[in-house]
Amino acid sequence: MNQEGASHSPSSTSTEPVRARWSPKPEQILILESIFNSGTVNPPKDETVRIRKMLEKFGAVGDANVFYWFQNRRSRSRRRHRQLLAATTAAATSIGAEDHQHMTAMSMHQYPCSNNEIDLGFGSCSNLSANYFLNGSSSSQIPSFFLGLSSSSGGCENNNGMENLFKMYGHESDHNHQQQHHSSNAASVLNPSDQNSNSQYEQEGFMTVFINGVPMEVTKGAIDMKTMFGDDSVLLHSSGLPLPTDEFGFLMHSLQHGQTYFLVPRQT
């Protein structure tokens, strides 16, 4: 019936016609994102069929739609990762020339702070965040990455696997209706090539945060820090406090839309 869509289908067993442009519903996006974040980024044929059957509870979908969604999602994830690494490298390079000057100024107490505050370049932070950076040591041990960074907001102000996921969405689908819609101009700036079949759902289930001053589009809920950034990085809030992760490398709390964060090397 739709020969063009069927010709590109990865040997689909679905009997329904494949729509050339599939706009998944919020409930379907939530399921797909949960599966992707659980580590299944390239499901085999039998898993694709299972996912498609689960998505059909909320609207028409074909195996090819599921296949291409995961293909596009992997591409976007790799692109965001490259953009973040490039932004981090550029930020570290731009502050390198001023590093020595900042540290000399701090050691000479030209920019004194009270006993309860220390200036790290992005506003005054309490002793709690200061102790995280200084570890009770002299200011000369502050990592150079923190010096010169500034926050646009000013000063400080379990995954149970694929099987449980399928079981959960078999009888708890009502929670999916709590999905909120966020519209962000940053998505079109960072991903101009995705303004086709994906344009209607990229903004659903996503939010925009600022990491090292760069607007980034991330998923709501738990984020796999280990997969996205590796074992040697820590994500900090603009207040200077590190975001805790569980034993599997997932953030224990969701990022907040519009907030500023910093990706820094883990201290040893």
UniProtKB/Swiss-Prot annotation:
Q: Could you list this entry's UniProt keywords, alphabetically sorted.
A: Developmental protein, DNA-binding, Homeobox, Nucleus, Transcription, Transcription regulation
Q: Which GO terms describe its biological process?
A: adventitious root development
* Region described as Disordered: 1-22, 173-198
Composition bias, Polar residues: 1-16
**What SUPFAM superfamilies would the database entry show?**
Homeodomain-like (SSF46689)
Is the Cytoplasm keyword given for this protein? no
Tell me one GO molecular function of this protein. DNA binding
Asked whether the keyword Transcription is assigned, the reply is yes
Mind telling me which GO cellular component terms the entry cites?
nucleus
- For this protein, the DNA-binding region equals 17-81
Instruction: List the Pfam families.
Output: Homeodomain
Q: Which cell locations does it reside in?
A: Nucleus
Q: Would you say which domain of life the source belongs to?
A: Eukaryota
Role played: Transcription factor which may be involved in developmental processes.
Q: Which family does it belong to?
A: Belongs to the WUS homeobox family.
Task: Cite the PANTHER family for this sequence.
Answer: WUSCHEL-RELATED HOMEOBOX 11 (PTHR46998), WUSCHEL-RELATED HOMEOBOX 12 (PTHR46998:SF5)
Protein name per UniProt: WUSCHEL-related homeobox 12
